[in-house]
């Protein structure tokens, strides 16, 4: 073989080696992109799966906070009637509960009674309603209101 032919073969061999290296690099890049898409898909599925449980937990916490705030508003209204020595009312009107100076919004997951009013006499005793019932997705929360002394008791009834 002559020198020019050897040089050409060497040049072709070097070119083929470089092309193989580029093909391998391209395959690695494609594999890395495929891995990235796979990981992104798995993370998306996990995020969507967890968002439902987070949402239900948030709703449960929101319900608990609402009932604690309702009980506090009940006691505040009772204290106001004693302090002012006047009859005071706590009005339940669907999505809003109010005592004239304070308002409490009922969350979307809870159905509150509408058109009911709890009236406290000058001594702070309840002189109107015997019970108030709220409906939730898990059942009912009923407040037993003791006439005369103004005490309140929460009773939870779950759906079967």
From Swiss-Prot:
Its main location: membrane. It is found in: Cell membrane; Cell surface; Fimbrium. The chain crosses the membrane at residues 30-50. The keyword Transmembrane helix applies. Keywords: Cell membrane, Competence, Fimbrium, Membrane, Transmembrane, Transmembrane helix. It is a single-pass membrane protein. Induction: Part of the putative comGA-comGB-comGC-comGD-comGE-comGF-comGG operon. GO terms for biological process: establishment of competence for transformation. Changing residue 35 to A: Reduces detection of ComGC in the mechanically-sheared fraction, probably corresponding to the pilus. Reduces transformation. One of its GO terms (cellular component) is plasma membrane. Coiled coil: none annotated. It comes from the Bacteria. Required for formation of the type IV-like pilus (T4P) that plays a role in transformation. Transformation pili are dynamically extended and retracted, perhaps thereby promoting DNA uptake and transformation. Involved in transformation. Required for DNA binding. The transformation pili are flexible filaments, consisting mainly of the major pilin ComGC and smaller amounts of the minor pilins, including at least ComGD, ComGF and ComGG, and perhaps ComGE. Interacts with ComGE. Interacts with ComGF. Interacts with ComGG. This is Competence protein ComGD.
């Amino acid at each position: 073989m002559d020198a020019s032919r050897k040089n050409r073969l060497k040049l072709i061999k070097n070119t083929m080696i470089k092309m193989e290296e580029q093909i391998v690099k391209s395959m690695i890049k494609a594999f890395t992109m495929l891995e990235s898409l796979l990981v992104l898909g798995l993370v998306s599925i996990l995020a969507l799966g967890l968002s439902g449980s987070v949402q239900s937990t948030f709703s449960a916490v929101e319900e608990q906070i609402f009932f604690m705030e309702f009980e506090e508003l009940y006691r505040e209204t009772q204290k106001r009637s004693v302090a002012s020595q006047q009859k005071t009312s706590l009005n339940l009107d669907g999505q809003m509960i109010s005592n004239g100076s304070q308002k409490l919004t009922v969350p979307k997951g809870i159905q509150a009674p509408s058109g009911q009013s709890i009236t406290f006499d000058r001594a702070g005793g309840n002189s109107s309603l015997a019970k108030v019932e709220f409906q939730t997705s898990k059942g009912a929360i009923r407040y037993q209101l003791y006439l005369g002394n103004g005490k309140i008791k929460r009773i939870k009834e779950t759906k079967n």
